[in-house]
């Protein structure tokens, strides 16, 4: 320590020299710039313009002064370089001193003593600034439960990833819903240097369920109290965040504050920015005990190792039991209990500067915390009103939040150069598959799309459905893009059963969809519709990937494989459930065909029965689907027979057959090599046939295709010759793969293709 401080004195002496040399020089020059008490300009031209006494000798003197000034400046620059080298060699007892250093404004915890010690020159740390190593992993814990909170977490994570320069390890205390959503999201996001671990929140309920809580977060709002018990025993420190947090700076700056903790300080918190704990918000307002204004727990720095040694579990439980005898319940969930503990043990807390948790609650005084934008580091939307909270600067905060809400998450897949990362099997396999492709191949983009991993957010809106107990339930499966959004309400009116939809959207479009859905009474009244967002990437519409995502996340034993442009007949849901029993789909390989028709009219009086449909067919109001452009697609359905059929009938597979079918949920997936327009359904029906599915046409079922503008992909198919060539190549490769997988049984498809 003596050597450290001796080096410090040398450093201070050198610094004083750096300051004194230019100061003395400028005093000399300044005094020499006066003649007879009047200022004399050092500029020869200015002097000549204003002084009649300008002479050649005085010009030489001033030129010599200017030369001397330049020499002094060169000496100063050299001295600065020496000082910077000396500072770089200065010994330090802090870890990671070779890495990036974050200098921060002090919090109030022991800050006066620290400043006094530095001024006195006898600080034990010699004024060393806190540091975070370049590749040090930052640990973040978040409690998340339910569908809405899962959406909020994504925005929080985006804001953290946008600014971060360090590896991150997220510890998510999640219920089964949030775990399913977020596990899929992070797995498909594939962000380098990010690790995610999940902890079952449902198993922790018994730890806090005995505490009555009036806060809107419910029982999950108390789970931060048990983090010392939940998180790994070898984890020493963690940043704990609420889901309604937005970062405006690098989280490493906050992580660096841990180095400022002293003595028994184990909690880093920002003071509450409302008068809640002062008890003067309304008459007879009785808050939980708190130190002054109390502290907000939206952002917490936890020293887990010290908390465990202090027996934190016992400490907060005893405090909660004692206070609940008088308070009966908590109003602000875990925050009330944290504050009650701090009231009794103020030495536990290190008060963070208020910009680490700028609170936008209903009664906030947070505007006193910041002066300009540069002061903001963390924004906390801690009001039930969220973005609708009243604040004179709320428009600025809202725009900052919306920036990350709509930010393209694919752009956050950037590498942290210079930091070794754990090998990710999925990422390595993807790179291997891509490296095997020939980039000079004219169909390279088509082939690449098959291996593209699209970021996926399951159950974007609240979903709640229990399949019927009789095991006949059927889910309608479809996929769509933003331009087909208007079909959702109509489909929901025609189909009362469960629906699974995969939506291909950008981040910004996902928010537009959210606003659209929340503004629709029809959609908000339905909780049995699963909306799964597959985020845009690449130039093709991944139609079969979308179908697979929607198929994979159904909870019923059967599914109706439809398309978003079709309206099913009224009552089709119940009719299909009866047909499942009638045709014994549970024990046989059958694909029930729903005959497809179309109209060219945007306003259609939808037929209520088969008789009405046949009448409209005869009048030319309806047509069999694609009869005029792609007859082969649905011709095997045998519409002539269907007109008079009263019982289900079997049809045989033919080339290019692509009906809409009802099958068991264990049927084969769609082949991902087919993207955009062409052969995506044909290939699937071919695979059903080779697996010996029977195609059964339902006599009293129908669906009608509604008119719409041509899609971008069909336009490319029609106008781009290379597109059609690549599609043909993919078809041939698919048929070859079928022959390899199914052998002799697949030969008929090659023959049928040659004859068609």
From Swiss-Prot:
Entry's localization field: Golgi apparatus membrane
Region (Glucuronyltransferase activity): 414-756
Entries under Gene3D superfamilies matching the protein: Spore Coat Polysaccharide Biosynthesis Protein SpsA, Chain A (3.90.550.10)
Cofactors, names only: Mn(2+)
Regions of compositional bias (Polar residues) in chain numbering: 44-58
InterPro entries associated with the record: Glyco_trans_8, Nucleotide-diphossugar_trans, Xyl/GlcA_transferase
Sugar attachment sites: 97, 122, 148, 272
Any GO CC annotation of this UniProt entry: plasma membrane
Metabolic or biological pathway, per its Swiss-Prot or TrEMBL entry: Protein modification; protein glycosylation
Parts of the chain on the Lumenal side: 32-756
Binding site for Mn(2+) 2: 563, 565
Transmembrane segments: 11-31
The record's free-text note on cofactor binding: Binds 2 Mn(2+) ions per subunit. The xylosyltransferase part binds one Mn(2+) and the beta-1,3-glucuronyltransferase part binds one Mn(2+).
A Pfam family: Glyco_transf_49
Example GO BP: macrophage differentiation
All ranges on the Cytoplasmic side of the membrane: 1-10
Region (Xylosyltransferase activity), start-end ranges: 138-413
Tissue: Ubiquitous. Highest expression in heart, brain and skeletal muscle.
Protein's membrane topology: Single-pass type II membrane protein
Region (Disordered), start-end ranges: 43-69, 81-109
pH and activity: Optimum pH is 5 for xylosyltransferase activity. Optimum pH is from 5.5 to 8.0 for Beta-1,3-glucuronyltransferase activity.
Its EC number(s): 2.4.-.-, 2.4.2.-, 2.4.1.-
Clinical disorder: Muscular dystrophy-dystroglycanopathy congenital with impaired intellectual development B6: A congenital muscular dystrophy associated with profound intellectual disability, white matter changes and structural brain abnormalities. Skeletal muscle biopsies show reduced immunolabeling of alpha-dystroglycan. Muscular dystrophy-dystroglycanopathy congenital with brain and eye anomalies A6: An autosomal recessive disorder characterized by congenital muscular dystrophy associated with cobblestone lissencephaly and other brain anomalies, eye malformations, profound intellectual disability, and death usually in the first years of life. Included diseases are the more severe Walker-Warburg syndrome and the slightly less severe muscle-eye-brain disease.
Functional note: Bifunctional glycosyltransferase with both alpha-1,3-xylosyltransferase and beta-1,3-glucuronyltransferase activities involved in the maturation of alpha-dystroglycan (DAG1) by glycosylation leading to DAG1 binding to laminin G-like domain-containing extracellular proteins with high affinity. Elongates the glucuronyl-beta-1,4-xylose-beta disaccharide primer structure initiated by B4GAT1 by adding repeating units [-3-Xylose-alpha-1,3-GlcA-beta-1-] to produce a heteropolysaccharide.
Family to which this protein belongs: In the C-terminal section; belongs to the glycosyltransferase 49 family. In the N-terminal section; belongs to the glycosyltransferase 8 family.
Protein name: Xylosyl- and glucuronyltransferase LARGE1
Annotated source species: Homo sapiens
